[in-house]
């Protein structure tokens, strides 16, 4: 409530201090990473905002789909590089953390870098055993955007999974 009162008065620094104090008092039992990220967004501090959003993925206070929606609405395309740098940094300590890989894949899609998006999709597919659903998604986007080389690569991956994969026949179309 106190932080919200500060936000209503556009006193973002006081709201930030309130959330930070709340986290200390809660001793890690509750995280305000999403709230802090939003406040830094309002202040125009993009790098700090991104850091908190990525931390929110890690502490579970935000999921990758929600973060994609927020980033689509508020992140300028020229800041995707900064986000990728944070994601790669986080992946060094948590290479199998799927939400980070999902956001990384999303940044490549937004930048129309379908080859790197496909690489991430393949990595996720191998880790999760999803039978190619993410790969098929990226391959279809690449084909629709005219990146046929990447699309063919994705469809080839699906074909190599064999007929037991749910997208085998669709990959042949």
Sequence positions of predicted segments:
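Acidic, polar-rich low-complexity tracts and alpha-helical solenoid repeat scaffolds
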Residues: 1-173
């Amino acid at each position: 409530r106190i932080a919200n009162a500060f936000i209503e008065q556009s006193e973002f620094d006081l709201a930030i201090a309130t959330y930070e104090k709340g986290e200390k008092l809660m001793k890690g039992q509750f995280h305000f990473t999403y709230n802090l990220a939003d406040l830094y967004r309002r202040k125009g501090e993009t790098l700090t905002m991104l850091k908190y959003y990525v931390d929110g993925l890690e502490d579970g206070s935000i999921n990758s789909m929600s973060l994609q929606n927020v980033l689509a609405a508020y992140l300028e395309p020229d800041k995707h590089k900064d986000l990728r740098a944070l994601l790669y940094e986080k992946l060094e300590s948590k290479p199998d953390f799927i939400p980070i890989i999902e956001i990384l894949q999303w940044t490549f899609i937004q930048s129309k870098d379908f080859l790197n998006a496909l690489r991430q999709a393949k990595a996720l597919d191998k880790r999760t055993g999803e039978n190619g659903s993410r790969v098929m998604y990226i391959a279809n986007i690449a084909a629709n955007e005219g990146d046929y080389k990447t699309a063919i690569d994705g469809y080839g991956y699906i074909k190599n999974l064999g007929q037991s994969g749910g997208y085998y026949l669709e990959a042949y179309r």
